[in-house]
Regions:
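Short alpha-helical scaffolding segments that buttress acidic/His motifs in well-ordered protein cores
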Residues: 112-116, 131-135, 172-179
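Solvent-exposed, amphipathic alpha-helical segments
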Residues: 36-43, 90-93, 97, 175-182
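Hydrophobic alpha-helical connector segments
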Residues: 85, 89-129
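Hydrophobic/aromatic-rich alpha-helical bundle segments in the mid-to-C-terminal region
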Residues: 124, 142-212
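N-terminal intrinsically disordered/low-complexity leader segments
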Residues: 1-28, 211-212
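Hydrophobic/aromatic residues within well-ordered alpha-helical segments
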Residues: 79, 83, 87, 105, ...
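Helix-turn-helix
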Residues: 32, 40-74, 78
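Residues at secondary-structure transition points
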Residues: 20-24, 28, 70, 74, ...
Length: 212
């Protein structure tokens, strides 16, 4: 971190454990800390990283880190929120693909299918392992799990609205969540052709009778 940024941050007395509003000069420091934490998670394949490790990687002092985030949980909260933003972006991309691939199907449902189809083609193992590590942070922590819960509530609200009461759509999406979980653990139970056929079957299954 530059001496200019350090001097700017020292102008305000910092109480340990209480995050401060980030000024313009400090925004780069904040992003360096977040990126350092992300890179450490990917390398170690665990979110169990110490503040000292993060400070060394980001080349910042612990006081500066606490100035911006207040605590390690302050960093984790933003990491989880950004991961949720990533999930929403993937879902939106899936819905856009579904509009082109499956114009006669509800995008909210078909989009989930296309999202997993794209996800299943990712070869980099750190992609799914990072997601697992981030989600592991939420175990037993109501603050960290809150943005994940809110996002899933919004997803299933869209699924329910699109399916007009057809619970088969919920079953299909829950099945896809199971496939995502297997993918996170890199458990491959279906060959590519079979997987694509199953995904098509799930879409057809979810779109049949609109009765429960």
């Amino acid at each position: 971190m530059s001496s200019t940024v350090e001097a700017e941050e020292k102008k305000t007395e910092v109480k340990r454990g209480r995050p401060r509003t980030t000024n313009v000069l400090g925004s780069n420091t904040k992003e360096k800390v977040l990126e350092s934490y992300r890179s450490l998670i990917k390398e170690r394949r665990t979110a169990d990283v110490s503040l000292d490790d993060i400070c060394r990687r980001a080349n910042v002092k612990k006081g500066s880190l606490l100035y911006h985030f207040g605590s390690k949980e302050g960093i984790q909260k933003i990491i989880v929120e950004r991961y949720v933003d990533h999930l929403e972006a993937c879902y939106q991309a899936g819905m856009q693909a579904a509009k082109e691939q499956w114009p006669d199907h509800a995008p909210a449902i078909a989009g989930f299918v296309e999202w997993f189809r794209t996800y299943s083609q990712v070869k980099d193992p750190t992609y799914s392992e990072y997601g697992l590590a981030v989600l592991s942070l939420t175990a037993g922590n109501e603050t960290l799990i809150a943005p994940v819960n809110r996002w899933y509530e919004s997803v299933f609200a869209r699924i329910r609205a699109a399916s007009e009461g057809n619970r088969k759509a919920l079953v299909a999406v829950l099945a896809l969540e199971g496939l995502f979980l297997l993918g996170h653990f890199r458990v491959k139970v279906l060959a590519s052709d079979e997987l694509n056929a199953v995904l098509d079957d799930l879409l057809v299954f979810s779109d049949k009778s609109r009765t429960a």
